[in-house]
């Protein structure tokens, strides 16, 4: 109920009715897993430098449909610490896209599908940082956090246990193949695999 009310007021702020499809009822059994690489961990001051996303339809990752964009930082420069994490240098972004163009392309890609991610709130906050000034809204899509599903799954098996929610731990525990970490597209693929592994487990219920 709260989500419906929130989306009602969110939609009223939409500056361009072309994007009203975002508020349509979510497509059943279709999801978008996405990940952002950024200049840092503060949505207030840091910028997105890459977005990677994949579509899941039913129980299949649709490999023919992917979203990968590199973006020129708007306000921040890359520091040594962040380069060590994602291995993206300023020279790699010299021909990057403008963030406003990428945000609009991203909206077309995700449509009204449910969003899936690992620590998804951070990535959504980064997207919303640019989306709100651009279109007046925040992402209205239904969202699923894989670390929450994994946590509930492990607690069900061993009540009151400590659950390590590090991405690498989850990947290894679920026997997900490891690709290069801190690459937005690779991370979105691995997150999609985590989601499908959990979704299809008999003891897991996706709310």
Q: Predicted segment positions?
A:
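Short, amphipathic alpha-helical segments that act as regulatory/interfacial helices
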Residues: 128, 192-199
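Short, glycine/acidic-enriched loop or turn micro-motifs at the edges of active sites
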Residues: 38-40, 148, 190
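Short alpha-helix plus adjacent loop in nuclease-associated cores
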Residues: 144-161
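Acidic, divalent-metal-coordinating active-site segment for phosphoryl/phosphodiester hydrolysis
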Residues: 183-194
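The feature marks non-catalytic terminal segments
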Residues: 202-207
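Conserved non-catalytic scaffold segment of RNase H-like nuclease domains
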Residues: 4-128, 133, 137-141, 164-182
């Amino acid at each position: 109920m709260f989500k419906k009310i929130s989306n009602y007021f969110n939609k009223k702020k939409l500056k361009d009715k072309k994007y009203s499809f975002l508020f349509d009822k979510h497509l059943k059994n279709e999801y978008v897993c996405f990940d952002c690489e950024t200049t840092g961990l503060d949505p207030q001051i840091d910028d997105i430098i890459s977005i990677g996303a994949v579509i899941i339809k039913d129980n299949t990752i649709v490999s023919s449909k992917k979203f990968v964009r590199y973006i020129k930082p708007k306000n921040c420069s890359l520091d040594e610490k962040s380069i060590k994490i994602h291995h993206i240098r300023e020279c790699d972004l010299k021909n990057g896209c403008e963030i406003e163009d990428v945000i609009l392309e991203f909206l077309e890609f995700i449509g009204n599908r449910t969003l899936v991610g690992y620590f998804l709130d951070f990535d959504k906050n980064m997207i919303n940082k640019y989306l709100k000034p651009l279109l007046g809204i925040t992402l209205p899509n239904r969202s699923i956090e894989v670390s929450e599903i994994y946590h509930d799954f492990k607690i069900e098996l061993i009540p009151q246990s400590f659950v390590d929610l590090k991405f690498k731990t989850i990947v290894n525990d679920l026997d997900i193949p490891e690709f290069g970490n801190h690459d937005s597209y690779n991370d979105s693929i691995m997150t999609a695999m985590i989601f499908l592994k959990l979704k299809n487990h008999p003891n897991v219920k996706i709310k």
